Amino acid sequence: MLCATVSGPSFCEAKQQILKSLHLVDIIELRLDLINELDDQELHTLITTAQNPILTFRQHKEMSTALWIQKLYSLAKLEPKWMDIDVSLPKTALQTIRKSHPKIKLILSYHTDKNEDLDAIYNEMLATPAEIYKIVLSPENSSEALNYIKKARLLPKPSTVLCMGTHGLPSRVLSPLISNAMNYAAGISAPQVAPGQPKLEELLSYNYSKLSEKSHIYGLIGDPVDRSISHLSHNFLLSKLSLNATYIKFPVTIGEVVTFFSAIRDLPFSGLSVTMPLKTAIFDHVDALDASAQLCESINTLVFRNQKILGYNTDGEGVAKLLKQKNISVNNKHIAIVGAGGAAKAIAATLAMQGANLHIFNRTLSSAAALATCCKGKAYPLGSLENFKTIDIIINCLPPEVTFPWRFPPIVMDINTKPHPSPYLERAQKHGSLIIHGYEMFIEQALLQFALWFPDFLTPESCDSFRNYVKNFMAKV
């Protein structure tokens, strides 16, 4: 069941949160410990409006256990259908509630801000009878979150395993895959009641209504991933295609690569987008490389097929496709590539095959030289770009925070989606350059990824819808 958490804090706010959320969820949770003191009539109104909600009252730090118990006793006398009670409540008090009010369904909850042993917690909780056992954990990285999800799928039902904090979102989105008895999101206009708890509208945007125990997982890995809009755009397309799948951003550092790939092997991943700094760091975890990835020695797309992980790169072809759409030929053109990372490698390799004369500018000259050798180009220190004479097209592949000498040839492209518009492109446009935004490349390389992931479902109409969604979204940024 999907549950909207309502926490006011005022009576009027709580009532509005219920009314706005009720039609989107299966049940409402009233966090009465967070709602301002209610009189009997107000409490009755909220319970009636919420239609058999879960009543929850957590113990405040300054509240004595005796007062907490009395509060729970008074709520139990209302004979709610559900009560959520923390496992720290003295057993005698819990037994009193169960004996006096046998019709109340109990959710026994355990919350921790640490990384703990899920199986041990669950087995200990089984000693206390309950209708649902809810365990909320705090993973320290994406791998730990995925390992919790794997273990949660094996627990006897009904149970609920969720994660808090920066890395907790996958457990919320994948709750149907886990077969959680209950999943929680902050109700419409309601504050979040736990670190990392998603808002209801955010959770639903992950194609949540289509998800089940048989869902496929797609996502983005890298560090950072917060600049990407892919969780919005890609889930829009998945929803439009009515696929039983979702797309989630997973922050993964280079040091976490080994544990991450160990975790995903036993989960229904079907595809991953790869961003920096992992494009060249994951080769040992791929079973086979497509020519597109071999050519540039960089991976931006993983396809999971027949128990194998296949590596591709759509960055270069995405740029080539975009330039062709704009009737821009690169044959015999002098193109400055700024940067020598994974995306720069893919773009340079593809444009070299189309006859471009490539000039690689980078902070580390050895990296520029290595790339120049691969694409039969020339390498230069980043600072020398300022006085370089012959440029027809410049493509910036450096992160937004890295400064470099701005040049304004006839065509200027910045592959960064954010910030939008980039200060560099704004200045280039004022100088009369034709500018190409990062989101335009993002669109084309993403569509090539989709063609690898689910070719049987992609249509020209859905591709156009995706393009329009991204363009309209970026216009509002």
From Swiss-Prot:
The active site is at H111, K134, K279. It comes from Chlamydia pneumoniae (Chlamydophila pneumoniae). Pathway: Metabolic intermediate biosynthesis; chorismate biosynthesis; chorismate from D-erythrose 4-phosphate and phosphoenolpyruvate: step 3/7; Metabolic intermediate biosynthesis; chorismate biosynthesis; chorismate from D-erythrose 4-phosphate and phosphoenolpyruvate: step 4/7. GO terms for molecular function: 3-dehydroquinate dehydratase activity; NADP binding; shikimate 3-dehydrogenase (NADP+) activity. GO terms for biological process: amino acid biosynthetic process; aromatic amino acid family biosynthetic process; chorismate biosynthetic process; shikimate metabolic process. Bifunctional enzyme that catalyzes two sequential steps of the aromatic amino acids biosynthetic pathway. In the first reaction, the AroD domain catalyzes the cis-dehydration of 3-dehydroquinate (DHQ) and introduces the first double bond of the aromatic ring to yield 3-dehydroshikimate; in the second reaction, the AroE domain catalyzes the reversible NADPH linked reduction of 3-dehydroshikimate (DHSA) to yield shikimate (SA). Shikimate binds at S228, I229, S230, N300, D315, Q445. This is Shikimate biosynthesis protein AroDE. Coiled coil: none annotated. The keyword Oxidoreductase applies. Residues 210-477 are annotated as: Shikimate 5-dehydrogenase. Residues 1-209 are annotated as: 3-dehydroquinate dehydratase. It catalyses: 3-dehydroquinate = 3-dehydroshikimate + H2O; shikimate + NADP(+) = 3-dehydroshikimate + NADPH + H(+). Gene3D superfamilies: Aldolase class I, Leucine Dehydrogenase, chain A, domain 1, NAD(P)-binding Rossmann-like Domain. NADP(+) binds at G339, A340, G341, G342, A343, N362, R363, T364, G438. 3-dehydroquinate binds at S21, E29, L30, R31, T56, F57, R58, R172, Q197. Keywords: Amino-acid biosynthesis, Aromatic amino acid biosynthesis, Lyase, Multifunctional enzyme, NADP, Oxidoreductase, Schiff base. Its EC number is 4.2.1.10, 1.1.1.25. It holds the Pfam family DHquinase_I.
